[in-house]
């Protein structure tokens, strides 16, 4: 059987990864092609205390082709924060961003450019 608590935690983790991909995670490379960020001091991934509480609920349904009637959740939860956050920023300041991460500095510069 599917463990709902484990599934909920997996969904929370995927959402957190999607938020990190959208807002903080940036990798750069040196002239030899090696990552310049070689530790978590340099490569910022969000932690639970950076984001706050994520409330996850599931709708019961049965998928006859999935194991035990289950559906995949990994792709859904990691891919949905990007469009949600980028559209929220667009609705707030009227600027679209086409590269990740969308940093606070980029948002501030976009707001300043409109003034």
Annotated model-derived regions:
Residues 1-115:
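C-terminal catalytic domains of large/alpha subunits in multi-subunit enzymes
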């Amino acid at each position: 059987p599917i463990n709902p608590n484990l599934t909920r935690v997996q969904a929370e983790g995927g959402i957190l990864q999607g938020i990190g991909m959208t807002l903080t995670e940036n990798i750069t490379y040196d002239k030899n092609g090696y990552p310049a960020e070689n530790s978590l001091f340099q490569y910022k991934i969000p932690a639970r205390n950076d984001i706050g509480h994520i409330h996850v609920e599931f709708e019961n349904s049965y998928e006859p082709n999935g194991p035990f009637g289950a559906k995949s959740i990994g792709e859904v939860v990691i891919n949905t924060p990007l469009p949600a956050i980028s559209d929220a920023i667009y609705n707030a300041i009227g600027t679209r961003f086409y590269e990740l991460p969308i940093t606070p500095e980029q948002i501030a510069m976009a707001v300043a450019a409109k003034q």
